[in-house]
Amino acid sequence: EALAHIEWEKPMVDTLRHRLVSKWNESEDEAFKHVIRFDVQKTEELFHGNWSDESKEEYELSNHTDVIYYGLDGIIKNRKVDLIIGGPPCQAYSLAGRAQDPYSMKRDYRNYLFESFVKIVEHYQPELFVFENVPGLLSACPGDTPVRYRIYDAFKSIGYDILSPNELKNAVYCSVNFGTPQIRNRVIIFGVRKGSEFKLKDFYEALNNRKSDKVFTVKDALGSMPKFRPLDKPIKVGRGNVSHELIGDVHIPLHIARYHSPRDVKVFEEWISKNMNHATTEERLNYYTKITGIKSNHIKYRALEWDKPSPTVVSHLYKDG
C-alpha cells in the first residue's frame, strides 16, 4: 500500500493522480490527497502542514486541504512506514549537465537536495529505503568532499547502513539487463535501518538475480507498431504542421509522427546513407555544426539501430514522446 507520493513538477503529479484513479481505483479525492505537489526542502511544512503564505501562494491550488493544514503526517497518521523510495533531481550530477555548466555544477544547490531525502527517512524511520540517481553522482564533488561520501555519512548519522563510498561503483545497473529496450544506467542505493532483520546484501543479491542475458531491441519494442507514410505535402493542423499519415485503421493513443521539416529529411537521409552512427566523434560534431551552424560538445544526432537497444532518451526529447 502506497501511503503518499511527493513530486515538485505538476505534470508528474497529474500523471500519478491519474494512474491512481484509472489503474488502482482510488477516488479522485483520495488521489488528490495522496499525491502531494510540494518542495521537499520545506520539510517542516511538508511533515506538519500549517503552510506559510508563500507556500500557499505557490502550491495551495495543487493540493488537498488536509495536506495544507495537517501535512504528510496527517495523511499517513499513525501507520508504519516500511519503505521510502526516491532521490533528488539528477541535473547536478549528470555528466551532460556538468559539461554544459561553466562551473561544472559545483555551485548548483541541487547537489545537496539529497539532504531533504535524508530528513524524510529520519522522520519516518522506515525499515528500508531505495535511493536512485545517475552514475555521475559517484564522481560529483561540489566542495572538498565528494557527494558519495556526504551521502554515506548522512545516512550513517541517522542509523542506516548503505554500501561504503567505494562500494557504490558496484551498485550501477543498466536497464538493458532488466528487459528494457533502452540503455539507461542508474546507481541504486539500498538502505537498511540498523538493528533491522533485513540484510543489505540480500537486496543486492535479489536485484542481481533478476538480471537477464536476453537483450530487447528497438525492433522488439516498436516493430509491430502501425507504420506511417509521408504526405505529398505537409498540412496545417491546429497550430502545428503534419507531414505523415498512419497506414491502416489501427489507432494507438499517442502513436503519432513528429513533423519532419525538409532539413530533418535531409539529415535522416545523409546520416543513414553515410552510416554516421559509426563515424568518429569529431565527424559527427562537425556534421551537426554544418547543418545547424551551431557548435556543440555533445553529439545531437543519432539514428536508432533496429537490432540494438535504444541509447538513453534524454529529457529534452519529451516533446517527441
Stretches with model-predicted labels:
Residues 85, 188-192, 314:
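Short, well-ordered beta-strand micro-motif
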Residues 1-124, 135-148:
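Core alpha/beta nucleotide-donor-binding catalytic domains of modification enzymes
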Residues 74-78, 93-292:
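Class I S-adenosyl-L-methionine
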Residues 3-5, 35-37, 162, 170, ...:
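Conserved beta-strand scaffold positions in the cores of enzyme catalytic domains, especially
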Residues 82, 118, 187, 299, ...:
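Residue-level detector of short, conserved catalytic/binding motifs and their immediate flanks
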Residues 6-7, 132, 315-316:
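Short His-Asn-centered micro-motif
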Residues 23, 197-198, 321:
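Substrate-binding/catalytic groove segments of enzymes
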Residues 215, 288-321:
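Class I SAM-dependent DNA methyltransferase catalytic core
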